[in-house]
């Protein structure tokens, strides 16, 4: 099986905190989402003309090595189309806080449940099970947003997050539609052969015995992808196998005809063929994986809006 992992859109640290001025017709604010006790950075976009209305909502997050700041053009387009659009950075990515681990055993006594400790950050590593947890917590956060319409929630995902949104829809019936573009949907490449299997399970054993820590932040071990995988966390991650756990969700899959990072037949094509609910498949001709962000970007954006309009608009 060919390695399936995805695009790491390059961005520097300063770009994530650079001032952002939204268009005049768009309401914009930054927000914080708490995921398993850690603060995640979010951005909220809405049409100013609909300030007093509940809106169909599109929740968005980045793929492997990206940040929420890169999603602003799409979020603005969705807001202009009448949606509440919310983007967020996973824990340990972009402007979100890092997860932390103790570097020494917890003290035996700590009044009021508090103690001072030295910790180490877990940052810019890729763990699909952690990331779907962040999606679930972002959905929980949305429930109290004044403009959020709880009956009309859609998810947008691209590349690695194109698989994450499928997984989330399979496990949360509040998701009514997804748009998944150039999505990778099966983590079992980590155990695809005996060499990969041994590497994955040896890493897990060493981590469990304290002989190996998390990868360093942002390290590149797979091509130019920023962020090393926590290999064992990919083994149970196979949303392509369970698409029919989301009968309530309309699923659109957009793929690149000349996809070079993985075999579409093992990912979106397989998911589309298996899914028995409302679905659509679009093959964009003559583009590679990265073309979805370049020459086919506007086409993909238009396809997403049309799909969400069909299944989320009143």
Language-model segment annotations:
Residues 285-290, 294-314:
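Catalytic active-site module of serine/aspartate enzymes centered on a nucleophile-bearing elbow/loop
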Residues 55, 60-66:
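Active-site glycine-rich loops that stabilize anionic/oxyanionic intermediates
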Residues 64-76, 90, 266:
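The serine-hydrolase catalytic nucleophile loop
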Residues 130, 136-207, 234:
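Primarily recognizes the serine-hydrolase "nucleophile elbow" in alpha/beta-hydrolase
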Residues 17-53:
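N-terminal cap/lid segment of alpha/beta-hydrolase-fold proteins
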Residues 106-146:
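Alpha/beta-hydrolase active-site loop
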Residues 78-99, 104-115:
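Conserved alpha/beta-hydrolase
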Residues 219-287, 299-303:
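Serine-hydrolase catalytic core
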């Amino acid at each position: 099986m060919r390695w399936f992992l995805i695009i790491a859109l390059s961005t520097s640290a300063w770009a994530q905190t650079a001032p952002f001025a939204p268009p005049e017709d768009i309401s914009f604010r930054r927000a914080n989402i708490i995921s398993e006790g850690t603060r995640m950075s979010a951005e909220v976009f809405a049409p100013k003309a609909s300030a007093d209305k509940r809106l169909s909502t599109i929740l968005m997050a980045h793929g492997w090595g990206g940040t929420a700041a890169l999603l602003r053009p799409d979020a603005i387009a969705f807001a202009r189309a009448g949606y509440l659009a919310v983007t967020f950075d996973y824990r340990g990515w972009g402007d979100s806080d890092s997860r932390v681990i103790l570097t020494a055993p917890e003290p035996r006594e700590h009044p009021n449940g508090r103690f001072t400790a030295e910790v180490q950050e877990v940052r810019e590593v890729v763990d699909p099970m952690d990331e779907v947890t962040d999606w679930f917590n972002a959905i929980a956060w949305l429930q109290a947003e004044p403009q959020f319409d709880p009956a009309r929630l859609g998810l947008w995902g691209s590349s690695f997050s194109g698989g994450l949104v499928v997984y989330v829809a399979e496990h949360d019936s509040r998701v009514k539609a997804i748009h998944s573009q150039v999505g990778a949907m099966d983590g079992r490449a980590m155990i695809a052969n005996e060499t990969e299997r041994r590497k994955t399970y040896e890493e897990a054993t060493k981590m469990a015995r304290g002989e190996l820590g998390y990868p360093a932040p942002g390290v590149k071990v797979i091509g130019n992808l920023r962020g090393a995988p926590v290999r064992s966390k990919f083994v149970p991650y196979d949303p392509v196998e369970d698409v029919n756990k989301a009968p309530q969700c309309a699923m659109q899959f957009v793929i690149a005809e000349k996809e070079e990072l993985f075999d579409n037949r093992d990912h979106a094509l397989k998911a589309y063929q298996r899914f028995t609910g409302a679905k659509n498949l679009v093959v964009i001709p003559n583009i590679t994986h990265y073309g979805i962000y370049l020459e086919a970007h506007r086409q993909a954006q238009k396809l997403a809006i049309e799909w969400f309009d069909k299944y989320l608009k009143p």
